Amino acid sequence: MSRLRIYDDTRPESPLLDTQDGAIIAAELQKIGVTFERWQATAPVAPGASQEEVFAAYRADIDRLVAERGFKSVDVASIAPDNPNRAELRRKFLDEHFHKEDEVRFFVAGSGLFTLHVGDKVYEIECVKDDLIAVPDGTTHWFDMGDEPSFVAIRFFTEPDGWVGHFTGTDIAQKFPRYVPTQAS
């Protein structure tokens, strides 16, 4: 189940809010310009599935979003717990960074933790299968897939180059707990 925890950015041990209610998650994130929606992942795909398999399963949804929002590039992050490069892949996203475009992800399997740093608050969003999240450009954040990553997310970009992170150089991400999934997705 999706989960949102909100913290003061100096108090990682004490959440100000901890909820699994989808309506509350969406409302709290909307306050900071983040879109959170529950969709239906209609085609079964397993973590580790190829980009081609995921594209084939979700072609209609991908085409619709590209047409509606003007995305120029789409790819798939699909990582299974037995991936030999999982530790390296995890490290790539663990430090605070931002993008010069919205970060839009649709989770079609598994789960991962987006952590946003907005003002003096930290928002941890556990995204699971059926979650769509759109983080506005310029929002500082990090992503943790856990020690044994198990997820498939379709990633949408307005820039043709795809994922380009601009790292802030702060250590805030190290001050917050690492991701341990609350459910098997």
Curated annotation (Swiss-Prot):
Reported cofactor(s): Fe(2+); Ni(2+)
Record: residues binding Fe(2+): H97, H99, E103, H141
Site (May play a role in transmitting local conformational changes): D102
A molecular function (GO) term: acireductone dioxygenase [iron(II)-requiring] activity
CDD domains attached to this UniProt entry: cupin_ARD (cd02232)
Ligand binding (Ni(2+)): H97, H99, E103, H141
Site (May play a role in metal incorporation in vivo): E96
EC number: 1.13.11.54, 1.13.11.53
Keyword match Amino-acid biosynthesis: yes
GO biological process, one term: L-methionine salvage from methylthioadenosine
Alphabetically ordered keywords of this record: Amino-acid biosynthesis, Dioxygenase, Iron, Metal-binding, Methionine biosynthesis, Nickel, Oxidoreductase
Pathway(s) this gene product operates in, as recorded in its UniProt entry: Amino-acid biosynthesis; L-methionine biosynthesis via salvage pathway; L-methionine from S-methyl-5-thio-alpha-D-ribose 1-phosphate: step 5/6
Cofactor note: Binds 1 Fe(2+) cation per monomer. Binds 1 nickel ion per monomer.
Important to generate the dianion (site feature) positions: R105
Cited Pfam families: ARD
Catalytic activity, reaction form: 1,2-dihydroxy-5-(methylsulfanyl)pent-1-en-3-one + O2 = 3-(methylsulfanyl)propanoate + CO + formate + 2 H(+); 1,2-dihydroxy-5-(methylsulfanyl)pent-1-en-3-one + O2 = 4-methylsulfanyl-2-oxobutanoate + formate + 2 H(+)
Stored SUPFAM superfamilies: RmlC-like cupins
Function, in words: Catalyzes 2 different reactions between oxygen and the acireductone 1,2-dihydroxy-3-keto-5-methylthiopentene (DHK-MTPene) depending upon the metal bound in the active site. Fe-containing acireductone dioxygenase (Fe-ARD) produces formate and 2-keto-4-methylthiobutyrate (KMTB), the alpha-ketoacid precursor of methionine in the methionine recycle pathway. Ni-containing acireductone dioxygenase (Ni-ARD) produces methylthiopropionate, carbon monoxide and formate, and does not lie on the methionine recycle pathway.
Assembly behavior: Monomer.
Record-linked PANTHER family: ACIREDUCTONE DIOXYGENASE (PTHR23418:SF0)
Entry's family note: Belongs to the acireductone dioxygenase (ARD) family.
Name of the protein described by the UniProt record: Acireductone dioxygenase
Species of the source: Stenotrophomonas maltophilia (strain R551-3)
